[in-house]
Amino acid sequence: MKNQDQALIFEVSKEGRIGYSLPKLDVEEVKLEDVFESDYIRVEDAELPEVSELDIMRHYTALSNRNHGVDSGFYPLGSCTMKYNPKINESVARFAGFANIHPLQDEETVQGAMELMYDLQEHLIEITGMDTVTLQPAAGAHGEWTGLMLIRAYHEANGDFNRTKVIVPDSAHGTNPASATVAGFETITVKSNEHGLVDLEDLKRVVNEETAALMLTNPNTLGLFEENILEMAEIVHNAGGKLYYDGANLNAVLSQARPGDMGFDVVHLNLHKTFTGPHGGGGPGSGPVGVKADLIPYLPKPILEKTENGYHFNYDRPEAIGRVKPFYGNFGINVRAYTYIRSMGPDGLRAVTEYAVLNANYMMRRLAPFYDLPFDRHCKHEFVLSGRRQKKLGVRTLDIAKRLLDFGYHPPTIYFPLNVEECIMIEPTETESKETLDGFIDKMIQIAKEVEENPEVVQEAPHTTVIKRLDETMAARKPVLRYAKPAPVQV
């Protein structure tokens, strides 16, 4: 029943069917022609579906049952930290004093909300080892861009206009070079060594007087801790550059290590990942940016300050890069992150990292006999396998991911990072039980055996979903973006 094909809402439509009722008009009727110019008025009615309320409920309930989320099943998407979002976060975010306020209210009327944001900033400062934090950026890549614009403003304020290049590792998130480009920089790639870490000799080769910054994730996207980070920071700083921390993998070091202590000058965080704001489906997110003291003058305005008279926004910042978002960040996600931090406490956050790392290493060791392990060493919160041996038997990593759908699992991240052939990146997070991990591992082992004994089963997967495999080429080149009403049948 769950996977039964579902008609489009347009196909359910019957002319004249009504799904609502409105009270009799009790004000003077106004004609559209009296309000809008003729150019803005439809000549023909829009072809909208005509359905009953029951039709609507059944249609969208059926579609929702096809969705997969953290609340419905294991979601081991590497580098995405798809952890469970505690429902206490939702309860607090729905407090009337948070849910019913408006960003244009006078500061005096929202002191409680401002206190929460200020306290959240203080917690993030302590967690990251930065000197201050802005909550304004809306999401991770937005935080990246904001941080890079701060670095650019810093160099330009010091008359250093030739620093036009940002260095990123070959294992970097795709958003890193993209954010650098949008911020006006040229990206330079630094290679990884045979251990999956940044090659120090190659870093020394590419760093020069044109280097604005080095962007790093630590641990990196392979799930490996950059153990030479202090030396890397020294190399970049001695050349006059800044060190940027992509906080995508902060879940691996909470309350155990701080970017600020590693030598990073700028850090962005993903509150919707590490600190359990719900994410996926396009947002919302929250990407606060923390900086060291020499970058504070350039933070986007306003900044939230505390005085003896309460909390207020300071707009008097002549060197600021300007606003990066209307108002002051995605407040609802910030409430959820604050609730999470306060409910967990320092010991709880430390346990988050301990269990995230334990889960990842447990899975890696159980799966290593059945898939190639490019870097056979202790990992942090996530790890990378390779489907090279399966590819030799005619089965691609994509096929393995499709086969997992038959067992009700969301596939891991595949083909990323780009420097691992047939890459399978798995991040279990700390919130999953051993029983859940074992269930997924058993299916991965089953798939590996199917590749050897009956590869067609994997090559033709999925078998149990409504949609099997999309024609991705046609979807990209000739997408169907609107419903076309069938022509009347000629009798």
Curated annotation (Swiss-Prot):
Protein family membership: Belongs to the GcvP family. C-terminal subunit subfamily.
Biological process annotations from GO: glycine decarboxylation via glycine cleavage system
TM region positions: none
EC number(s) on file: 1.4.4.2
UniProt protein name: Probable glycine dehydrogenase (decarboxylating) subunit 2
Keyword entries, A-Z: Oxidoreductase, Pyridoxal phosphate
Cofactor names: pyridoxal 5'-phosphate
Record gene name: gcvPB
Subunit structure: The glycine cleavage system is composed of four proteins: P, T, L and H. In this organism, the P 'protein' is a heterodimer of two subunits.
Annotated positions of the N6-(pyridoxal phosphate)lysine modification: K273
Pfam families: GcvP2_C (PF21478), GDC-P (PF02347)
Catalytically driven reaction(s): N(6)-[(R)-lipoyl]-L-lysyl-[glycine-cleavage complex H protein] + glycine + H(+) = N(6)-[(R)-S(8)-aminomethyldihydrolipoyl]-L-lysyl-[glycine-cleavage complex H protein] + CO2
Protein function: The glycine cleavage system catalyzes the degradation of glycine. The P protein binds the alpha-amino group of glycine through its pyridoxal phosphate cofactor; CO(2) is released and the remaining methylamine moiety is then transferred to the lipoamide cofactor of the H protein.
GO molecular function: glycine binding; glycine dehydrogenase (decarboxylating) activity; pyridoxal phosphate binding
GO annotation, cellular component aspect: cytosol; glycine cleavage complex
Lineage per the UniProt record: Bacteria, Bacillati, Bacillota, Bacilli, Bacillales
